[in-house]
């Protein structure tokens, strides 16, 4: 068994983080992606690792050398990385791909230590790790049947929000047998590149193979394993929260001040949300008028106070619309001069309105 890592891309969306290095050299919580990945591969007793390099490839080679703590590394260079996509990078490594059973992985991933082992412990020779669709996911999706056969690859251009209940996201970690690579994948890869071009994705080849015979490649759905694909600065920020050490994780989330829908496994007890609002009828009305609400300019405060007066039967002159609960919390906290107990996690507007000596915190045992 060998591993093949695709690491040729420029990572432009990471801006200053990739100005002088390739994406896999970007640190997450102080550890470079490539160091984390190779450390995980070290535990598998592989024959070697093949890395396809391109942008800042020499810097990566200088950093890693040809041996990583006893793990042999072979490099394949993509000299036109700025004009091609990962299908070309993989095509350059087609000979290496056919020499051994292979774990194929993209270099901009961060994931739990057990992910590779999931593939190796499964007896099926050709597998794609997939995760049930969540709102933060982007890129290629798949649909699978009851036997975990991949029946369709859904490219980004064909994504349909009406079908998200059927979608699984490819984690971009695969296991290919030597036989599959030699007899199926590489022949189709060569034909596809010749017919369509080199500025494509290697998963498009898998899409064709599964269309012709969906029993060659199975999906392996993950459950609670953590992973993230780092394409831009926001991805990096989220990944640093998801993969923070236990001692840092609370502060990583506190510092976000909301937006916790990006972490679907988290229950938010900090911020002011109302499970009874909006009503189903109001949601339906908003959805029906979404385009108007999004594109038209809203009314001013005078009209808002009039509408509130109509809804609640209060004289308009007694109503002052505010910009959220934070304005009311400021007034509330100024009414009490004593110490106030705060259970954490909490809505930080409460303790932020008090001097430190007037806050009595209670922090229960916390674990994600």
Which residues does each predicted region cover?
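Conserved beta-loop-beta/alpha segment of the NTase-like Rossmann-fold superfamily
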Residues: 68-140, 146
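Conserved core of the PLP fold type I
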Residues: 294-368
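N-terminal nucleotide-binding beta1-loop-alpha1 segment
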Residues: 1-18
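Conserved alpha/beta core of the MobA/IspD/sugar-nucleotide pyrophosphorylase nucleotidyltransferase superfamily
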Residues: 1-3, 167-255, 261-265
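N-terminal "arm"/small-domain region of PLP-dependent enzymes with the aminotransferase-like
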Residues: 244-296, 368
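Conserved core of the sugar-phosphate nucleotidyltransferase
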Residues: 112-196
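Catalytic metal- and UDP-sugar-binding loop of GT-A-like glycosyltransferases, i.e.
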Residues: 6, 105, 269
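Conserved N-terminal catalytic core of the sugar/cofactor nucleotidyltransferase
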Residues: 1-5, 31-100
């Amino acid at each position: 068994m060998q591993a093949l890592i695709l690491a040729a891309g420029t990572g432009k969306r990471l801006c200053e983080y990739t100005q002088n290095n390739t994406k896999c050299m970007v640190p997450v919580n102080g550890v470079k992606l490539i160091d984390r990945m190779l450390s995980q591969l070290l535990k598998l007793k592989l024959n070697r690792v093949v890395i396809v390099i391109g942008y800042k490839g020499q810097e990566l080679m200088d950093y890693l050398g040809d041996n990583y703590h006893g793990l042999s590394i072979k490099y394949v260079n993509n000299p036109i990385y700025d004009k091609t996509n990962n299908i070309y990078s993989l095509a350059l490594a087609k000979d290496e791909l056919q020499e051994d059973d292979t774990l194929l992985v993209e270099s901009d991933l961060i994931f739990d230590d057990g992910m590779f082992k999931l593939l190796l412990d499964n007896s099926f020779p050709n597998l794609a790790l997939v995760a049930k669709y969540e709102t933060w996911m982007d890129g290629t999706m798949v649909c699978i049947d009851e036997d975990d056969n991949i029946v369709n690859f859904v490219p980004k251009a064909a994504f349909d929000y009406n079908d998200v209940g059927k979608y699984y996201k490819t984690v971009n970690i695969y296991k290919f047998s030597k036989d599959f690579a030699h007899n199926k994948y590489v022949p189709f890869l060569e034909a596809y590149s010749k017919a369509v071009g080199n500025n494509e994705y290697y998963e498009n080849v898998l899409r064709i193979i599964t269309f012709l015979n969906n029993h060659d490649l199975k999906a392996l759905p993950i459950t609670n394993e953590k992973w993230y694909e780092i394409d831009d600065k926001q991805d990096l920020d989220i990944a640093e929260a998801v993969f923070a050490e236990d001692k840092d994780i609370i502060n990583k989330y506190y510092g976000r001040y909301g937006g916790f829908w990006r972490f679907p496994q988290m229950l938010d007890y900090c911020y002011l949300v109302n499970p009874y609002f909006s009503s189903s009828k109001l949601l339906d009305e908003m959805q029906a008028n979404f385009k108007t609400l999004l594109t038209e300019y809203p009314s001013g405060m005078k009209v808002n106070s009039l509408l509130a007066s109509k809804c609640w039967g209060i004289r308009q002159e007694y109503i002052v619309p505010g910009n959220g609960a934070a304005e009311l919390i400021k007034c509330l906290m100024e009414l009490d001069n004593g110490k106030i107990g705060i259970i954490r996690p909490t809505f930080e507007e409460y303790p932020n309105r008090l001097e430190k000596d007037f806050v009595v915190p209670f922090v229960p045992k916390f674990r994600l």
